[in-house]
């Protein structure tokens, strides 16, 4: 299916179609299942924490599942990509179950789950891509253990930074703006002043 789409609209068209489909599917599913999401119990120790009481939480469940479906449909089938998609869903589910729980999970439980996800992601990357690093005109190889440690630190820190920014709910708007802003720059030969004047 993707090959026939590529022959008709090209890679840019397939990328645009995947982007629009993910957006439309997420918007549709969010409007359909918004009332089914867990609701905030209020944050006892946060400034104005009571104001968040009752707002829907856990929209990452909808967001990530839609992204995963579109990714599996539009990306070439590779075991590596499937593993990353499963890890993305696992990371989302840990946050969702924490949001849905009557009493929030403690930091150690969330940290261990995130750490395990980071290790599996690091091992997956290194097993499929090796330990070589290419940066501009330089190329070098890192020892497996050092590279794995750096990957685990990066992923584990990234997951926790997302949690600190109110989860994927708080992060998704800024990511969407950056993605939408980057798309025309990535797929055209226009300079930024030309795009701004359009």
Regions found by a protein language model. Give the residues of each.
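"…together with the soluble PPM/PP2C metallo-phosphatase catalytic core" -> "…together
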Residues: 2-190, 197
